[in-house]
Amino acid sequence: MSEITGIARQKIHPGKLDEFKRLAAECMRVARIKDTGTVQYDFYFNADESECIVYERYRDSAALQEHLQNLGDLMGQVMAICTTTGEVLGEPSPELANG
């Protein structure tokens, strides 16, 4: 299995920056405690903090799937307050690619 890299661009909805930052911090806390195959998981804000780049690296597809399961409802809360686009780099498993 190969390493998987994710790059997400999140445009934060107006008035939701504080909530986004709170949720991002909680996502990072959960990832540090529960994830076993996460290599890197970082949030980078633009100058006016209207957008955030999330740079993620995982040991393999199974590690990314574990991360998504660990975040659970938190991910839904984040997605509700921003518009997200992104890329997955590497060779994700068929389950991850189709899931």
Give the label of every model feature segment.
Residues 5-10:
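Active-site-flanking beta-strand signature of metal-NTP-handling nucleotidyl enzymes
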Residues 11-21:
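Short, surface-exposed ligand-recognition loops at beta-strand->loop->(often short) alpha-helix junctions
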Residues 30-39, 57-99:
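An amphipathic, aromatic/His-enriched active-site/gating alpha helix that lines ligand/cofactor pockets
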Residues 44-48:
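Short beta-strand micro-motifs enriched in acidic
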Residues 50-52:
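Hydrophobic residues embedded in beta-strands of well-ordered beta-sheets
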